[in-house]
């Protein structure tokens, strides 16, 4: 709460999950899937203790997804379907989740780097016109991640469900000209795992199975440190084989797929995506920065988002960065490699890093009125109020 007794809400709308709660808290109050579903056929009115409605959102939609036509309002971190997005926000602020009177609250929202201006304008418009929040602030996700880590300068590798961003931040300001985006993230890895399991003879082709495979991925997948070695183990031994019990009681065996699926992050061609993988993209981003800032960036690489949770990811990133630095900067001179300092921070709570940073920032700002865009300012200026965030509005 701020000094006037208004609640300060923090809402991190991801492509896959919504994380929402209050300023100053150290964990989201609610985490639920960012999906909206509509029944395919209305034959029953109840499944278990869930009532089937014309519009199902979040947890309920996820549980009944086999009976629904499901839509994710966000794609690659950007809102694609505003009507469904409003349903998602109604659910977030309504009695099912936060249960707040939006007119007497302030809200801090997060946005991906390189978010189109139109997208940001529309979000502010909806927050003031539909929900009538008293104050709104929009923060860039990568900057919040660094705040949560207690840093002002660093490179954030943020990989969620819909998109992966590599975003350098200097003295608290994100550098859009250096920000890179890779359209491979959690959802693509899950799809690829479905494909790999199909080759093993397990068919997961229904949208309801998607959730099951996501759970298999979270439980069993890891990033291989040395791919040749992993492939040898997968082919010649059964060391990697793990059993997994499906919701219907069947047991499946998963082997080499455990490291093959996340490998798409490093080798996008595996899932027919052009371009370089996450390690090379990170290297290119840092090398494109001003020469004086590079060493700071190499020493403060921060991982964030659910798709950076794979065991083995930090060490593989470090290995590839060292290799690239040796080949392209030192031209193979191994002697000089010992001077190359690199540090990859993988905080244990990185899945909710953006929310945590948002909760910290909102708490610091709660009584500083000059930071927030207010409803009154919006009524006077319209979307030009965004200039207050230091954003140029065309």
UniProtKB/Swiss-Prot annotation:
**What PROSITE patterns does the record tag this protein with?**
ACTINS_ACT_LIKE
Q: Could you cite one Gene Ontology molecular function of this protein?
A: ATP binding
Tell me which residues bind ATP.
160-162, 214-218, 305-310
In its keyword annotation, does this UniProt entry include Secreted? Answer: no
**Entries under Pfam families matching the protein:** Actin
Q: What is its main location?
A: cytoplasm
Single biological process term from Gene Ontology: response to ethanol
Q: Does the keyword Zinc apply?
A: no
What is said about its interaction partners and assembly? Component of the Arp2/3 complex composed of ACTR2/ARP2, ACTR3/ARP3, ARPC1B/p41-ARC, ARPC2/p34-ARC, ARPC3/p21-ARC, ARPC4/p20-ARC and ARPC5/p16-ARC.
The record describes the protein's role as:
ATP-binding component of the Arp2/3 complex, a multiprotein complex that mediates actin polymerization upon stimulation by nucleation-promoting factor (NPF). The Arp2/3 complex mediates the formation of branched actin networks in the cytoplasm, providing the force for cell motility. Seems to contact the pointed end of the daughter actin filament. In addition to its role in the cytoplasmic cytoskeleton, the Arp2/3 complex also promotes actin polymerization in the nucleus, thereby regulating gene transcription and repair of damaged DNA.
Record protein name field: Actin-related protein 2
In its UniProt entry, the species of origin is given as Rattus norvegicus (Rat)
């Amino acid at each position: 709460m701020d000094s006037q007794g208004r609640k300060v809400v923090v809402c991190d709308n991801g492509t896959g999950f919504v994380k929402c709660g209050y300023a100053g808290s150290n964990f989201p109050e609610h985490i639920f899937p960012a999906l909206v579903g509509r029944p395919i056929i209305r034959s029953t009115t109840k499944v278990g203790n869930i009532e089937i409605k014309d519009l199902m959102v979040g947890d309920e939609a996820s549980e009944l997804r086999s009976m629904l036509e499901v839509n994710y309002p966000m794609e690659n971190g950007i809102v694609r379907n505003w009507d469904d997005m409003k349903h998602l926000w109604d659910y977030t602020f309504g009695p099912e989740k936060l249960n707040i009177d939006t007119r007497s609250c302030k809200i801090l929202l997060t946005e991906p780097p390189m978010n189109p201006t139109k997208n940001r304008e529309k979000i502010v418009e909806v927050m003031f016109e539909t929900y009538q929040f008293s104050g709104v602030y929009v923060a860039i996700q990568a900057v919040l991640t660094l705040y949560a880590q207690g840093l002002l300068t660093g490179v954030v590798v943020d990989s969620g469900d819909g998109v992966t961003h590599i975003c350098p931040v200097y003295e608290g300001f994100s550098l859009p000209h250096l920000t890179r985006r890779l359209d491979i993230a959690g959802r693509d890895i899950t799809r690829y795992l479905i494909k790999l399991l199909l080759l093993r003879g397990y068919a997961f082709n229904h949208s309801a199975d998607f959730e099951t495979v996501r759970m298999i991925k979270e439980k069993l997948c890891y990033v291989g440190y040395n791919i040749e070695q992993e492939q040898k183990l997968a082919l010649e031994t059964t060391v990697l084989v793990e059993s997994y019990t499906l919701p219907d009681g069947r047991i499946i065996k998963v082997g080499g797929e455990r490291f093959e699926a996340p490998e798409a992050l490093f080798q996008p061609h595996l899932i027919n995506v052009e371009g370089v993988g996450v390690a090379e993209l990170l290297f290119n981003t840092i090398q494109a920065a001003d020469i004086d800032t590079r060493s700071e960036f190499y020493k403060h690489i921060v991982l964030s988002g659910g798709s950076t949770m794979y065991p083995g990811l930090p060490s593989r990133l470090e290995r590839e960065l060292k290799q690239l630095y040796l080949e392209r900067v030192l031209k193979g001179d191994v002697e000089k490699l010992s001077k190359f300092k690199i540090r990859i921070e993988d905080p244990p709570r990185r899945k909710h890093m953006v929310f945590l940073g948002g909760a910290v920032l909102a708490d610091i700002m709660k009584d500083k009125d000059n930071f927030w865009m207010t409803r009154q300012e919006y009524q006077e200026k319209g979307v030009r109020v965004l200039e207050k965030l230091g954003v140029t509005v065309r």
